[in-house]
Swiss-Prot record:
One of its GO terms (cellular component) is transcription factor TFIID complex. One of its GO terms (biological process) is response to virus. It comes from Mus musculus (Mouse). TFIIF is a general transcription initiation factor that binds to RNA polymerase II and helps to recruit it to the initiation complex in collaboration with TFIIB. It promotes transcription elongation. This is General transcription factor IIF subunit 1. Heterodimer of an alpha and a beta subunit. Interacts with GTF2F2, CTDP1, TAF6/TAFII80 and URI1. Interacts with GTF2B (via C-terminus and preferentially via acetylated form); this interaction prevents binding of GTF2B to GTF2F2. Keywords: Acetylation, DNA-binding, Nucleus, Phosphoprotein, Transcription, Transcription regulation. Phosphorylated on Ser and other residues by TAF1 and casein kinase II-like kinases. It is found in: Nucleus.
């Protein structure tokens, strides 16, 4: 450049030549300043391409003809790519990263990744000075950022899993030791508290350790004393009501029912609440005298005796004397019946049904008009009320009738046969009391019935016994089992073990 005006500055001119066609391509290697790269210490350097990603871009090699080939496979693959807009990238070695190894195997390793978009809006040139003093400018093609690779060997999947298990063991060990320390601390604190208690003055010494129990027992005794005084006052003011006695009776009868009952005993009673005909209207209940509502379920001998005791209080002393004379005889028999009822729940239910039917027959003979008859529902008598459920008329009848009915029932019980049972249960719906009893003719243990059940699906003996319940058939449990065994021998059904249980089935 020439000097400008009168300025005395010396300017040196350089010639820069830009070659049009060059075989060489220049790239820039960028290192991070934190890596502290010093080229003066490099004795040996090796640079090579990382071609490990070549497998990703390669297509599966399939034979075009012969065994294993597909017709027009390439054409169909191209059509699929066009349909979904898939553009395959070609594997270009110049786009792959560089691997730089310095000073042999023991030296450092660097990986250079190509930085895209560097030469889009800018142009970088490398100037080299020639022997004649002129500079040659070469454009930069690519820019690579080099980062050091980790020297340590990475773990494989199996090694990583082993290390993870070891870590869990170590953490568990630490947690266990921490728990032991906490326990030891708690024990030390407890021992210190005991020592402090033992060091107290002798005036504070107490013989009984359970202070809370003593306080609770004293409170309970005070409360029981107050309750006793209240009950004595209540007895002086008014006589004991029936409701209070009925609650006590319910507790005892509930316990007995739950102890003696078996699976499926009360399955036949599930339909009892479906009909509304047996439920009396509120107007009728207002007109009637209040009768205690007894619990649902079979009525035992204890309940009959208690209900008779209730009726004693309402009667004049003349009837009390007559009833006492009649009651003296059946007391040992009642004890015997209690033992029988605890042995077999099914037989107890059947005996209760028989007792009710016999009492109903006796009432029909005496022709004692009930206070008010309950209208049974329009359906069958079986669905309206449970067997053994006491009605309002049964509660209001005289005790003499009850005692005579219990005698009659005890006499019949000794010589009880299945045929007599059926006859008595069939005559039950004809009673004047309006009480409904289940008829024995509804379900019968027959060969056709068993065959019908077994052709539907495989069943166990327990399932068959549930189908033929004692309430429906009128037979005892032992008789039902014997009849079923004989029918199964005649039918000779197929036997299969399903879930560790023997199932019987028949084919049509």
């Amino acid at each position: 450049m020439a000097a400008l005006g009168s300025s005395s500055q010396n300017v040196t001119e350089y010639v820069v030549r830009v070659p049009k066609n060059t075989a060489k391509r220049y790239n820039i290697m960028a290192f991070n300043a934190a890596d502290k790269v010093n080229f003066a210490t490099w004795n040996q350097a090796r640079l090579e391409r990382d071609l490990s990603n070549k497998k990703i871009y390669q297509e599966e090699e399939m034979p075009e003809s012969g065994a294993g080939s597909e017709f027009n496979r390439k054409l169909r693959e191209e059509a699929r790519r066009k349909k979904y807009g898939i553009v395959l990238k070609e594997f270009r070695p110049e786009d792959q990263p560089w691997l730089l190894r310095v000073n042999g195997k023991s030296g450092r390793k660097f990986k250079g990744i190509k930085k895209g978009g560097v030469t889009e809006n800018t142009a970088y040139y490398i100037f080299t000075q020639c022997a004649d003093g002129a500079f040659e400018a070469f454009p930069v093609q690519n820019w690579y950022n080099f980062t050091p690779l980790a020297r340590h060997r990475t773990l494989t999947a199996e090694e990583a899993e082993e290390e993870w298990e070891r870590r869990n063991k170590v953490l568990n060990h630490f947690s266990i030791m921490q728990q032991r320390r906490l326990k030891d601390q708690d024990q030390d604190e407890d021992e210190e508290e005991k020592e402090k208690r033992s060091r107290k003055k002798p005036s504070e010494l107490r013989i009984h350790d359970l202070e809370d129990d003593l306080e609770m027992s004293s409170d309970a005794s005070d409360a029981s004393g107050e309750e006793g005084s209240r009950t004595s006052k209540a007895k002086k003011k008014a006589p004991v009501t029936k409701a209070g006695r009925k609650k006590k009776k319910k507790k005892g009868s509930d316990d007995e029912a739950f102890e003696d009952s078996d699976d499926g005993d009360f399955e036949g009673q599930e339909v009892d609440y479906m009909s509304d005909g047996s439920s009396s209207s509120p107007d009728e209940t207002e007109g009637k005298p209040k009768v205690p509502q007894q619990e649902d379920g079979p009525k035992g001998v204890d309940e009959q005796s208690e209900s008779s005791e209730e009726s004693e209080e309402e009667k004049p002393p003349e009837e009390d004397k007559e009833e006492e004379e009649e009651k003296k005889a059946p007391t040992p028999q009642e004890k015997k019946r209690r033992k029988d009822s605890s042995d077999d729940s099914d037989s107890s239910e059947e005996s209760d049904i028989d007792s009710e039917t016999s009492s109903a027959l006796f009432m029909a003979k005496k022709k004692t008009p009930p206070k008010r008859e309950r209208k049974p529902s329009g359906g069958s008598s079986k669905g309206t009320s449970r067997p053994g459920t006491p009605s309002a008329e049964a509660a209001s009848t005289s005790s003499t009738l009850r005692a005579a009915a219990s005698k009659l029932e005890q006499g019949k019980r000794t010589s009880e046969t299945p045929a007599a049972k059926r006859l008595r249960m069939d005559t039950g719906p004809q009673s004047l009391s309006g009480k409904s009893t289940p008829s024995s003719g509804d379900v019968q243990v027959t060969e056709d019935a068993v065959r019908r059940y077994l052709t539907r699906k495989p069943m166990t003996t327990k399932d068959l016994l549930k189908k033929f319940q004692t309430k429906k058939t009128g037979l005892s449990s032992e008789q039902t089992v014997n009849v079923l065994a004989q029918i199964l021998k005649r039918l000779n059904p197929e036997r299969k073990m399903i879930g560790d249980k023997m199932h019987f089935s028949l084919k049509e």
